[in-house]
A protein has these predicted regions:
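N-terminal subdomain of nucleotide-sugar transferases
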Residues: 1-12, 44-46, 64-79, 211-214
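Short N-terminal targeting/anchoring amphipathic segment
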Residues: 42-60, 79-84
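Membrane-proximal helix-turn-helix segments that form the acceptor-binding/catalytic region
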Residues: 70, 89, 101-151
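Conserved donor-binding/catalytic core segment of Leloir-type glycosyltransferases
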Residues: 153, 186-204, 209-216, 222
């Protein structure tokens, strides 16, 4: 016996579409009536006991939280709202706690001071996009939709500490690391190399790792994954890129 599970998602094209859609997309990234209507159909059909939210900002938007709350009141169902925080979006409009122009770590928006996002051009280095990011954060701070979230799952203790800077979240967060299947240890041939697996992007610390690789030319580094900084990784003389590793044999054969 297991639990019944259903999923709802939506894709928004931020770069294509008509001129009208490009003009209206900033509003739709903040509040989506369409997402509320479509989610209501899922709620009425599935009648969930728990709604588990992931990365809803700018796509489904936090407006779906309001629809879940409305549905709960109208049906009398005790449906819990759980949110897994994969980044810092709820406390930082560019979700990275990092300025894309200076490449410096930044916590100026913590505590709800979202105007700093515009001052630093923190969303893609653009004033216009940063204004939209600031407006989105300020609107939902004013609206108070996040107070309806029952529990916030953070993927690390560090992420939890940053989420806890908002008193509204501090009593709701829990650190729960991403789980993996348990495997029995095996005897392997010892080889001298360093393995990185994950996305090749700035927020993952790839630039720092590349600098480290250059400082340690006698050590081999193996990279498993892909991402926007893949070209920089491929230029390493002591680095080997394996793409997405489907089995350990890809690494063992290196």
């Amino acid at each position: 016996m297991g639990n019944r599970v259903n999923a709802y998602t939506s894709d928004m094209d931020f770069h294509g579409g008509s001129k009208l859609s490009k003009l209206t997309y900033p509003i739709k990234t903040i509040y989506s009536k369409e997402a509320r209507v479509q989610l209501r159909k899922v709620l009425d059909d599935f009648k969930p006991d728990v709604c588990h939210l992931n990365n809803f900002n700018y796509q489904l938007t936090p407006s779906i939280i309001l629809e879940i709350v409305k549905w709960r009141k109208e049906t009398g169902r005790d449906c819990k709202i759980i949110f897994t925080a994969h980044d810092y979006q709820l406390v930082c409009p560019n979700h990275q706690l990092k300025n894309p122009i200076t490449h410096e770590n930044c916590e100026k928006c913590l505590g709800g001071h979202f105007m700093n996002c515009v001052k630093g051009k923190c969303v893609h280095g653009s004033t216009a996009k940063s204004i939209v990011g600031m407006m989105e954060a300020e609107f939902w701070k004013w609206n108070g939709a996040y107070k309806y979230i029952d529990k916030i799952i953070c993927c690390s203790e560090f992420l939890k500490t940053k989420m806890d800077t908002n008193p509204l979240f501090a009593t709701k967060t829990i650190a729960m690391h991403n789980f993996v299947e348990k495997v029995e240890p095996k005897e392997v041939e010892k080889k001298d190399y360093v393995l990185y697996f994950g996305r090749f992007s700035e927020e993952k610390g790839i630039n720092t790792l590349v600098e480290t690789c250059n400082l340690l030319p006698d050590i081999q580094f193996i990279f498993a994954g892909s991402g926007p900084l893949e070209d920089k990784v491929n230029q390493l003389k002591n680095g080997v890129t394996r793409g997405y590793v489907l089995s350990l044999s890809c690494v063992n054969n290196t």
